[in-house]
Amino acid sequence: MRALAIACVAAALLERATVATAGQSAPGPDEFAARLAALALLQSLNAELLSHDSATATLERWCANHRLAEPAQIVAERLREEKPASAEVRAALEVRPDDPLGYRRVRLKCGDHVLSEADHWYVPGRLRPEMNLTLETSDTPFGKAIAELHFRRRTLSARLLWSPLPDGWEMSATPPETEAGALAIPPYVLEHRAVLSLPGGEPISEVVETYTGEVLAFPSPVAR
């Protein structure tokens, strides 16, 4: 209910404000209504991510609900990079220092919008062979590739990388000062770290997801 209320507030505010994403300019001015709308939307997305097991499915719904692309489909753009797992990651996955781990870094896109970048460390021995093959040879999002395992997600941390309004703004008698020009949104706005586990509790992957300013790059409502 809280997420729904926040989304309704954001929709109403967006009738009055347009925001620019990732430092790009837009017609909307940097004003209190635009910043409040951006904050409400980020909190709404954060709540959705925290309350569902699949970030891919959550982003796909976000893409559809906010008309980011047609069709509203999330695709993974795989980046051929390597990043060794830290001792902390191995501890979270309950594996020994010499146990093999898979690694995958992807950008999740909806149409032309890159909505997030994700680092996945996973335990190949706890996945089905066909799932490992899919992860190694295709751009299928991780959550879709292992969906048949009915995995569960446990969030380790979630933090805003950008706050449109300063701390304590709600206690002020006057709105915070804003800058001249369009409201600029930085490249990265939200970060989640989570462990994905089998229904029995055995961990299969740790993921660090960094969400971009493009999550707010949807068209403003048309006044009627």
Residue locations for each model-derived region?
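Bacterial N-terminal signal peptides
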Residues: 7-16
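Positively charged n-region of N-terminal signal peptides that target proteins for export
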Residues: 1-4
